Regions:
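Basic, Lys/Arg-enriched alpha-helical interface segments
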Residues: 1-77, 83-102
Length: 102
């Protein structure tokens, strides 16, 4: 059983999967390395990790009005995510960092 602050990943969003499968082998490998790292972290560690750059998206809301956030996945890719209790739900991946905020 995961500890109460443990990050659980939800990678089932079709848009996220489409984005992920569009990456080449090397870039996809870097994305998976970050996902493995995230799975080992607690939520408090995610918020403190300067490399991930957890940022609130002010310009839009997610499903059911949930707040949206971006995190740095690689030096070239950001993910749009929302937090749902222990789950970090991945909504999309963005090669252009600015597009994650639109």
């Amino acid at each position: 059983m995961p500890k109460s602050d443990q990050v659980l990943l939800d990678l089932n969003n079709p848009v996220f999967q489409e984005d992920l499968f569009s990456f080449g082998k090397e870039e996809a490998g870097r994305v998976f390395a970050t996902l493995r790292e995230l799975k080992r972290l607690s939520w408090s560690e995610v918020h403190r990790d300067k490399g991930l750059r957890w940022e609130l998206v002010q310009s839009k809301r997610g499903p059911g009005g949930m707040r949206l956030y971006t995190i740095r996945i690689t030096d070239k890719v950001r993910a749009l995510v929302c937090r749902d209790d222990q789950f970090m739900r991945f909504l999309s991946l963005h090669r252009d960092h600015d597009s994650a905020y639109r």
